[in-house]
């Protein structure tokens, strides 16, 4: 327990009006200031209320109390918001996978747009010249990657739990379906429970990773070609017995899935049964097919990834004579479509395994002559590092949550030393608005760029995850 925490369970009958929503989808309300606070010109105590939405009048139960704020859960909604929605999932409110199913999808998008704009204004001290129209797609059954936890509760409950963790806890949610997973995978959750329960290593199989590839031909009359390819990676901390192996093979045959095993680190992931198969996704606009392995990083939302790539390349305005850098390139998700447009593209990636996959994908798509790749730690970058990459008219950056601070600082140094190496335009794809805003501050106030446009992509509906895209031009 953190110092200052006061775990309580106090029902508050006095109604309060919720003002805004935070990124954890908690309603934020504020008590009227006490006489002492008012005398010191201070505002009242902040209450974070789980399950409450802006504009709603609610009563609540305080669950944790600190000197400056309290946490609570909604007790009764006296006046619901017009944008309140009925959650579709039975595990909503318990499972930590989704936090916003009770909020209309349009309101979800508006909230994420506000988060992006607020962070740009308050952290970066920059206002975008243009706000891009938010991008959205299917709101259910969109997630093609997932990591599920498994816990044996056979002693107390007579079952195994398989699912996402409960919100901000180490407990696994008791879920028999998941509305954001494709239906054929959601329907497998009860069957996976039975499978794991029957294994001799039920206590030593803590995780199942799901990776789904696109069908070979979705329009085909052949069911084998029109079905998505589904891989399940079982994290087995003990060797399987012969009986365990038989159960896994029977499960794979019955449910038409591809089973992989991971006995130790990520480097030990290998196919178990069947031994052959192919996971891939496609970018039809660019005539690109991207094979991948279950352990490779890919976007979880195939439909929105197509829209993401299309918008990024359109905004980059690549010319046939351009040299382009793609930083944090992964398996080539942006690099290979860019190679269809540019004279030459260099993809740089921190992980050796993804760099190797990117090279393989370039060869698979006949683009090895236009797309090259190198492995480099992009969190240890100096101006000399950037200079060694050579000049490029266009850059695309798609960093992980920690952002690209070292790269931005290196560009700021080059702005003062060797500005001819700076790209004319940068498209930055972000999965964390706060680190994005930090990097925007560096590029706009220290590296000589202006923020031309910014917008969100609703890559993860019903979650608080904010995916965004911004464009920088040399000032």
UniProtKB/Swiss-Prot annotation:
What does the entry list as the binding residues for S-adenosyl-L-methionine? 299, 328, 333, 349, 377, 398
Tell whether 4Fe-4S is among the UniProt keywords.
Answer: yes
As one GO molecular function, the record gives: 4 iron, 4 sulfur cluster binding
Give the EC number(s) listed in the UniProt record.
2.1.1.190
Keyword Transmembrane helix assigned to the entry: answer is no
| Broad EC category | transferase
Pfam families on file: tRNA_U5-meth_tr
Q: What does the entry list as the binding residues for [4Fe-4S] cluster?
A: 89, 95, 98, 178
Q: What Gene Ontology terms for biological process does this UniProt record contain?
A: rRNA base methylation
The chemistry this enzyme catalyses reads: uridine(1939) in 23S rRNA + S-adenosyl-L-methionine = 5-methyluridine(1939) in 23S rRNA + S-adenosyl-L-homocysteine + H(+)
Q: Which residues form the TRAM domain?
A: 1-76
Q: Where is the active site?
A: 431
Q: Please indicate which superkingdom the organism of origin belongs to.
A: Bacteria
The record's listing under Gene3D superfamilies reads:
2.40.50.1070, Nucleic acid-binding proteins (2.40.50.140), Vaccinia Virus protein VP39 (3.40.50.150)
Known role? Catalyzes the formation of 5-methyl-uridine at position 1939 (m5U1939) in 23S rRNA.
Query: What's this protein's family per the entry?
Result: Belongs to the class I-like SAM-binding methyltransferase superfamily. RNA M5U methyltransferase family. RlmD subfamily.
Write down what this protein is called. Answer: 23S rRNA (uracil(1939)-C(5))-methyltransferase RlmD
Q: Which organism is it from?
A: Polynucleobacter necessarius subsp. necessarius (strain STIR1)
Top-level taxonomy: Bacteria, Pseudomonadati, Pseudomonadota, Betaproteobacteria, Burkholderiales
Gene of origin? rlmD
């Amino acid at each position: 327990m953190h110092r200052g925490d006061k775990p309580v369970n106090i029902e508050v009958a006095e109604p309060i009006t919720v003002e805004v929503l935070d990124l954890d989808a908690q309603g934020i309300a504020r008590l009227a200031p006490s006489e002492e606070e008012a005398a010191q010109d201070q505002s009242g105590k902040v209450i974070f209320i789980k399950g409450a939405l802006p504009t709603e009048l609610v009563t609540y139960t305080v669950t944790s109390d600190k000197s400056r704020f309290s946490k609570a859960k909604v007790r009764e909604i006296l006046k619901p918001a017009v944008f309140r929605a009925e959650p579709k999932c039975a595990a909503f409110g318990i499972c930590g996978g989704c936090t916003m199913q009770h909020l209309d999808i349009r309101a979800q998008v508006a909230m994420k747009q506000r988060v992006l704009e607020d962070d740009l204004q308050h952290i970066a001290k920059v206002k975008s010249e243009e706000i891009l129209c938010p991008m959205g797609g299917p709101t259910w059954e969109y997630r093609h990657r997932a990591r599920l936890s498994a816990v044996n509760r056979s002693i107390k409950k007579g079952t195994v739990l398989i699912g996402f963790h409960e919100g901000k806890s180490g407990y696994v949610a008791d879920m028999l379906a998941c509305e954001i997973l494709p239906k054929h995978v959601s329907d497998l959750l009860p069957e996976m429970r039975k499978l794991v329960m029957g294994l001799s290593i039920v206590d030593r199989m803590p995780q199942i990773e799901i990776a789904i590839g696109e069908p070979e031909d979705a329009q085909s009359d052949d069911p084998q070609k029109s079905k998505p390819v589904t891989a399940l990676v079982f994290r087995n901390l003990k060797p399987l017995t012969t009986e365990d192996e038989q159960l896994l093979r029977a499960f794979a045959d019955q449910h038409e899935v591809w089973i992989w095993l991971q006995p130790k680190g990520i480097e030990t992931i290998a196919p178990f049964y069947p031994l052959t198969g192919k996971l891939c996704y496609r970018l039809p606009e660019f005539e690109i097919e991207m094979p991948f392995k279950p352990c490779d990083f890919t976007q979880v939302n195939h439909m929105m990834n197509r829209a993401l790539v299309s918008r990024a390349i359109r905004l980059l305005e690549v010319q046939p004579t351009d040299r382009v850098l793609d930083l944090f390139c992964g398996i080539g998700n942006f690099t290979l479509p860019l190679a269809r447009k540019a004279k030459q593209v260099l993809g740089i990636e921190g992980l050796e395994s993804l760099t190797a996959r990117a090279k393989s994908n370039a060869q698979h798509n006949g683009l090895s002559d236009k797309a090259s790749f190198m492995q480099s730690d992009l969190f240890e970058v100096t101006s000399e590092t950037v200079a060694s990459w050579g000049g490029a008219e266009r850059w695309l950056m798609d960093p992980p949550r920690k952002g690209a601070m070292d790269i931005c600082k290196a560009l700021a140094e080059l702005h003062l030393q060797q500005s001819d190496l700076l790209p004319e335009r940068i498209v930055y794809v972000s999965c964390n608005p706060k680190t994005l805003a930090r990097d925007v501050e560096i590029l706009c106030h220290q590296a000589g760029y202006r923020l031309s446009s910014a917008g969100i992509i609703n890559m993860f509906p019903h979650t608080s995850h904010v995916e965004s895209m911004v464009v920088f031009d040399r000032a």
